Amino acid sequence: MISLDGIRKVFKAKRGSVTAVDGVNLKINEGEIFGVIGYSGAGKSTLIRMLNMLERPTEGSVIVAGKDLSKLSDRDLRIERQKIGMIFQHFNLLWSRTVRKNIAFPLEIAGVPKKEREKRVDELINLVGLEGREEAYPSQLSGGQKQRVGIARALANNPKVLLCDEATSALDPKTTDSILDLLVDINEKLGLTIVLITHEMHVIRKICHRVAVMEAGKVVEEGPVLDVFRKPKEHITKEFVKQVTEPEETVQHLLNEVKSGRIVQLTFVGESAEKPLITNLIRTFAVDVNILQGKISKTQEGSYGTLFIHLDGPKDEIEKAITYMHEQQLELEVIAGA
């Protein structure tokens, strides 16, 4: 659906130049939700703006639905841009227009007849859950409602791709989740390809199928969300994963608290996160099992979790319990107790 080949973006400055995106290659599949995560200055905003040519790449090609956008004439590019919707962190609504007229705006520009335009606006209002707020102005809306207007407006021309530029960064956690749920619903109902950028791993975990991690203009890691959570390779990726998996207290604190037995860190992925592991350990082996800390989260591809447990008892029984856990295909690390 989307292919980025050797994308590079250099901005000229008074003292030299700044490379914002440096040699990025990405393939984004049709119908998937693809996330790009990175800290401020990583180049992710520049990258997403090149997907619809709001920024033109210095080098490389941007191919969307088989067409190289970087080689199109201005007229042809305007036509192709209608197939790519975009929503923004600060909504970018027209404050003098009602909800209905904001959503209708791109249809007016496209020359859609009034009756057809009104029908499409009604469909979109229902899709994003803004029934009863059609005649309200942006100043009368909550942050979440404003973003719903932005989403509806971005979908007005039936795009094939939706770009989300930090779309939930200005929202509180509860509203963020409601907008993320809406994006998943739209993805499933419309088969829409969604590309989002964020600095929050919670957003990636909750709705993305695959993720790319950016640092200093480069993609340093990429893959299915579950794989990246399970085995992050780069230091920056590990930092992001810790946002949603790291227990509140440190491992060092656990080491100081426990004087005997073994402390084991378990990583659950997919179906293994649903198994009654602790119950089976207690029933099968002569060991005491104490849960120290843990968390299980849901991703679009299945469950993911981390768990710290303390095993105490006869040494041979502890060894049997650890062997059993290995046999359950769990990621396991003994972090204390030789």
From Swiss-Prot:
Statement: the UniProt record of this protein carries the keyword ATP-binding: yes
One MF term in the entry's GO annotations: ABC-type D-methionine transporter activity
Assembly notes: The complex is composed of two ATP-binding proteins (MetN), two transmembrane proteins (MetI) and a solute-binding protein (MetQ).
Protein name: Methionine import ATP-binding protein MetN
GO cellular component: plasma membrane
Annotated binding of ATP, by residue: G38, Y39, S40, G41, A42, G43, K44, S45
Described purpose of this protein according to its UniProt entry: Part of the ABC transporter complex MetNIQ involved in methionine import. Responsible for energy coupling to the transport system.
Topology in membrane: Peripheral membrane protein
Domain ABC transporter, first and last residues per copy: 2-241
Main location: membrane
E.C. number(s) listed in UniProt: 7.4.2.11
Family: Belongs to the ABC transporter superfamily. Methionine importer (TC 3.A.1.24) family.
Keywords: Amino-acid transport, ATP-binding, Cell membrane, Membrane, Nucleotide-binding, Translocase, Transport
Matching Pfam families: ABC_tran, NIL
Record-linked InterPro entries: AAA+_ATPase, ABC_transporter-like_ATP-bd, ABC_transporter-like_CS, ACT-like_dom_sf, MetN_ABC, MetN_ABC_transporter-like, NIL_domain, P-loop_NTPase
Catalysed reactions, as listed in the record: L-methionine(out) + ATP + H2O = L-methionine(in) + ADP + phosphate + H(+); D-methionine(out) + ATP + H2O = D-methionine(in) + ADP + phosphate + H(+)
The protein's enzyme class: translocase
Compartments it resides in: Cell membrane
